[in-house]
Amino acid sequence: MIMHSNYDPNIIEKKWQRYWEEQHAYACDIDPNKKKYYVLEMWPYPSGNIHMGHVRNYSIGDVIARIKRMQGYNVLHPMGWDAFGLPAELAAIKHHTQPADWTYTNINEMRAQLKRLGYSYDWQREIATCDPDYYQWEQLFFVDCFEKGLVYRKKAPQNWCPSCNTVLANEQVIEGSCWRCDTSIIQKELTQWFLKITDYAEELLDDLTTLKYSWPDRVITMQENWLGKSTGVEISFPIESSQDFITIFTTRPDTIFGATAIILAPEHPILETLLNDTPQKEKLYNVIEKMRNMDRLERQSNLLTKEGIFIDRYCINPCSGDKIPIWIGNFVLADYGTGAIMAVPAHDQRDFDFCKKYNLPISIVIQPDELQINEHTIVEPWTGLGTLIHSGQFTGLTNKEAKEKITQYLEKIGKATRVVSWRLRDWNISRQRYWGTPIPIIYCKNCGVVSVPKNELPVILPTNITINEDGSSPLPQESSFIDCMCPQCGGIAKRETDTMDTFVDSSWYFARFVDPKNTKQPFDTSIAKYWLNVDQYIGGVEHAILHLLYSRFFTKLLRDLGYLPSNINEPFAKLLTQGMVIKDGSKMSKSKGNIVDPNQMINIYGADTIRLFCLFAAPPERDFDWSDSGIEGSYRFLHRVWRLFIDVQPHIHTTHAGNSTVIETTTALTKDVKRKEHITIKKVSEDIENKYQFNTAIASIMEFVNTLYLSKNELILTVEGKNILSSAIATVLTLLSPMTPHICEELWSYLGHSTSISLEPWPKWDPQALLKDVVTIVVQINGKVRNKFEVPMDLSKEELEHIIFNDTKITQYLEGKTIQKHIIIPNKIINIVTT
């Protein structure tokens, strides 16, 4: 075979991409004789262009997939499209087209871009969420949940984005703004559909322990905090001159004697009763309305300026009998706990800040054991351990003892109940958008709310539709979609016009990939049992709460609905969160003018160079700053590999990686090259398998290539040298092929192989080959290094002593001294102790 003298990626990459596609090289199916491995990267939204963040994410996944195949696994590595969402509607308005047309055009473009990068996807499994063949199953899940009471409809204040014209889930509001467009959100009362994710709160929390060693600590912590489990007590405070009472939630019943205010959320239902006869009713309702319109997450923030107003009513402390003023506070949330708190300023920072601002009393009821604090000099609350004071019959108890004793007392008098509270709220999945999965619900005047019969699914989203210029959904005006017959009574009815949150689409796609062509069910349970769960999932940490939490919930939901096997409790066994690709110190964006176009880079340098640089620039979990010099360096290295192969090709023969194990080496050079070959195999294997440190793995391959460059001219002079060099070249190509598959396939074929390098077994290192023939012995006298010796490995004790004690430098240090003892650690060190 005639080899090109120059490395031209544009020629060889197209050649091998065509070969892989024609051969269906990465297609897979169930094989009971093989151990499976399912690797998946978070799929993209089809915006039309991949970016460098995609390239980094997918390059990491592709390396893992390729190595696992070479290790003998049956590898599932699919790709698809998270295709519903607002951008398609905005593009349709801008370009006067249909969202479906825009979306499918982008899918075609992005598929071609991903193929240009040589990723080893099984494209026969490709799916898109906007395809009715996909979303019909999502609608089926909804109907199942409706029948089992796991989805419900209610009217409540919702996060509303005025720009996107839709509701946002709490998780989609970032610091008071829309997660997508950064517009400040407002509160709007709407009737919405909710999935009962709270039914799974305990399991979602408990099962995080099974992920402790395979998911990043940061993600585990973020999910724990979002779930927000609090074990505490609900305590009833009677309202003065009333039969009513206010129930508060607290985790600190030991501080109840220090409560100096009851603070209500502005949405608390009892306010209507409390304010009914108040002269300041109008003023109070103005304040309440202002608080209600604040962003929910802003109200939770520690940075919030805490505002409140006294409503001129009082509660009675059930322990002390003291009157406590009732306030309304902007930092109290109606849907957390009971929507009411007792403020204990002496022992809580939030309460301290609020009460100091409004000159409310501060009553110390816990005295630290080694510090004296009093109401007049206190500058910050005491939140630690201590002994109760000013607490009636409980004075003198430690606060840990008092928690239980006070709770028991309040339970006895009927004023307390032990409860568990959660920060997590049910998932609002209704969206006032067009381009999404239709919610399969029908509204009938006679029958009420009715689900679409399963045999009538899917409810097809109309695709030839006029998009409203103001961004609102056109579905409410689309009579051909809305008007229908009630499936129960046959009367005139209306369809639901809200569509599902697009995070529903991506919460179960990993399961559809295992059986994507199934037209009878979402996936066959036996097939799911073979492939699931995903062995390695890869994506950004920014999805720690939204996507990853929802996917965990959906896995448990589909298990309980009978779609997934009973032993599948988690979607992703291992999680790798990669950092961002940044440029000039900031995230790439059009507005900053620092975008690097992958297509342009491929045109200049080739896909292998781009892949190599993205893997080499930094450890995967860290951000890396794009640099032109870095990409040039990766390009030069591949040229160097090509040039090395050209130089040695006439002198080497067809062989396999690590074959030097069976070659007997007799010279210092061949022994050294053989040892470095196996050191490299070990280093690359361990760095990738155990730590996913692709950068250090690539660095070790580069070092080995340099070794071969320096030694090739001498190695080609002997048969033994040629044999060692042949094995070494095969090893370089095999180890490098998961990162840069095109160039390695090309050189592998020039080496005389007729099969793809991806079918090669991953090389194994020989422990014996790692050993040096010569070792360095360090000599210490009274703890100080006095000399070093290069000696044959495993030299006998007598021979080693003869060399050391006859060395002039050592004898100089020993002159006039008595040797008390000497200790030899074979092949490493000798310690001599003298007096």
Swiss-Prot record:
Its EC number is 6.1.1.4. GO terms for cellular component: cytosol. The keyword Protein biosynthesis applies. SUPFAM superfamilies: Anticodon-binding domain of a subclass of class I aminoacyl-tRNA synthetases, Nucleotidylyl transferase, ValRS/IleRS/LeuRS editing domain. GO terms for biological process: leucyl-tRNA aminoacylation. It comes from the Bacteria. Keywords: Aminoacyl-tRNA synthetase, ATP-binding, Cytoplasm, Ligase, Nucleotide-binding, Protein biosynthesis. Pfam families: Anticodon_1, tRNA-synt_1, tRNA-synt_1_2, tRNA-synt_1g. Belongs to the class-I aminoacyl-tRNA synthetase family. NCBIfam families: leuS_bact. This is Leucine--tRNA ligase. The lineage of its organism: Bacteria, Pseudomonadati, Thermodesulfobacteriota, Desulfovibrionia, Desulfovibrionales.
